[in-house]
Amino acid sequence: MAETAVIDPPHATEPTSLPTESADPSGPAPSDENALTQPSESAVTATTDADGTQKKTKKIIRRKRRPARPQVDPATLKSEPPPQTGTVFNIWYNKWSGGDREDKYLSKHAAPSRCNIAKDSGYTRADKVPGSYFCLFFARGVCPKGHECEYLHRLPTLHDLFNPNVDCFGRDKFSDYRDDMGGVGSFTRQNRTLYVGRIHVTDDIEEVVSRHFAEWGQIDRIRVLTSRGVAFVTYTNEANAQFAKEAMAHQSLDHNEILNVRWATVDPNPLAQKREARRLEEQAAEAVRRALPAEFVAELEGRDPEARKKKKIEGSFGLEGYEAPDDVWYARTKELEDARKAGQLEAPEQHLMIEPAPSSSSAALPSQSEDTGIFSNSTVAALRGLAGGNVTTQKAPVNSGGPLVAYGSDDDSD
C-alpha cells in the first residue's frame, strides 16, 4: 500500500487556516466570489509506492484573502459633543469658540484605537470597484463595517494612483497648507515627508521611530533631532505618507506620549534640494524610457553593442564619414517601424495577373494630342461620340495688331 508524506519546503512558513466562517456567528459568511486570491504557495508531496520507489510531486495551494474584520464594535460608538471650552458652539466645525484660549498641545487626547495591518486588512466591497479610495476610519483604527465597507482596507501601493487634487482617502486638497501644516495638504507640490513631534526622548529614538512608521509603507529616509524629540520621516510614495499621517495622529510610540504629526515644510538644506531635483530627473528619465522603443533606449545607454555597430554602418546614409544626429536617426528608425506596423495591419495588395484590354475609344485616339483650337483632340473625339459625329471645330482667330501697327513717332528718340 502506498504511503504519502508531505514535506514542507525550507522557505515555507507555517500554513494558516482558511477563514471559513465569520468570527461573529450571526454575521454573513464570506462568499467565494468576493474572495481575492493571494499568491499561491507550494508544498512538496512525497509518495512511496509498493515497490519502495519514492516520487516527489509539487502541489500548489491557493489561499484566499480573508475579509476585513470590524475594528470596533458598532454598539460602542457614541457621538458625544465636545466639552464646553468657550461661549459659542459652532455647529459647522463641531467645537466651541470664544472664552479662554486653551493650549492646543496639552488639550490633545490620545487616539482611542490604532490600526493593525496584519490583523485588520482584508477585502471589502471596494475591491470590486476600480479607482476606489482608502478608508479613513480604517487608517485610524475605528472602522466598524469590516468587509462591508465601501472603501479599501489595506495599505497603498505604487499602483494606486489618484488625481493630484485629492489624497488617497478622496478628500480635496487645497492650494496652500494650513498655518499649522495639518489637514489634507496642498496640491501645489508632492509632499512625502512627515513632521513628528512630542516624541519621548531616549537614546534609541531613531530605531523606535523607524519601527513604528515602517508599518505604513517603505521609508526613504529618517532624520531625527534627538535633543528636541522631533523626527522627519520621508516615504517613497506620497499615498503612504498620507496614510501614515492619519494612522499615527495622536498615537504613542513606546511610551505614553501623544504624537503631533504634521506635514513637513520645504527643507532649506541645499543637499536635500539637490536630492529632490535628482529624484524628479530620475522620474522624468523613467517616463522617457517608457515612451521610447526599447532598442533605442538600449542604444543610448550603451547596453547594446550590436545597435552601435548598426548605427555606425547605417547611420551614414551612404555618405562616407557622416554621422547622423540622434534625432535624425531616431526619426528614421521610427519611420521604418511605423511602416512595418502599417504593413502588418493592412492586407497586402494583390497584383492582377491579366491586364485589362484598352477600350476601343481610347485605342482610336492618336497617341499625341495637338491643340488645334479651343478644345483638344481628345475632347473633340468625346463630343463626336456623344453627338453622333456632327461636331465641327474652328481654329481660334489670330488677334490683329489693331491701329497701332506700324505706328511711327515724329520724335527723334525712335
UniProtKB/Swiss-Prot annotation:
The protein's role, per its UniProt record: Involved in the first step of pre-mRNA splicing. Required for cell growth and cell cycle control. Plays a role in the levels of the U1, U4, U5 and U6 snRNAs and the maintenance of the U4/U6 snRNA complex. May provide the link between the 'nineteen complex' NTC spliceosome protein complex and the spliceosome through the U6 snRNA. Associates predominantly with U6 snRNAs in assembled active spliceosomes. Binds directly to the internal stem-loop (ISL) domain of the U6 snRNA and to the pre-mRNA intron near the 5' splice site during the activation and catalytic phases of the spliceosome cycle.
Basic residues composition bias: residue spans: 55-68
Zinc finger (C3H1-type): 130-156
Upper taxonomic lineage: Eukaryota, Fungi, Dikarya, Ascomycota, Pezizomycotina
Transmembrane segments: none
Sequence similarity: Belongs to the RRM CWC2 family.
Biased composition (Low complexity): 356-369
Protein's cellular compartments: Nucleus
Gene3D superfamilies to which the protein is assigned, alphabetical: 3.30.70.330
UniProtKB keywords: Cell cycle, Metal-binding, mRNA processing, mRNA splicing, Nucleus, RNA-binding, Spliceosome, Zinc, Zinc-finger
Cystines in this chain: none
SMART domains the UniProt entry points to: RRM
Entry protein name: Pre-mRNA-splicing factor cwc2
Subunit structure: Associated with the spliceosome.
Main localization of the protein described in the UniProt heading: nucleus
Comment block on domains: The C-terminal RRM domain and the zinc finger motif are necessary for RNA-binding.
CDD domains noted in UniProt: RRM_cwf2 (cd12360)
UniProt record, GO biological process: mRNA cis splicing, via spliceosome; positive regulation of cell cycle; positive regulation of RNA splicing; spliceosomal snRNP assembly
Gene (UniProt): cwc2
Sequence segments annotated as region (Disordered): 1-86, 351-372, 390-414
Source species: Aspergillus fumigatus (strain ATCC MYA-4609 / CBS 101355 / FGSC A1100 / Af293) (Neosartorya fumigata)
GO-annotated cellular components: post-mRNA release spliceosomal complex; Prp19 complex; U2-type catalytic step 1 spliceosome; U2-type catalytic step 2 spliceosome
Domain spans labelled RRM: 192-266
InterPro entries cross-referenced by the UniProt entry: Cwc2/Slt11 (IPR039171), Cwc2_RRM (IPR034181), Nucleotide-bd_a/b_plait_sf (IPR012677), RBD_domain_sf (IPR035979), RRM_dom (IPR000504), Torus (IPR032297), Znf_CCCH (IPR000571), Znf_CCCH_sf (IPR036855)
GO MF annotation terms: pre-mRNA binding; U6 snRNA binding; zinc ion binding
Ranges of compositional bias, category Polar residues: 34-51
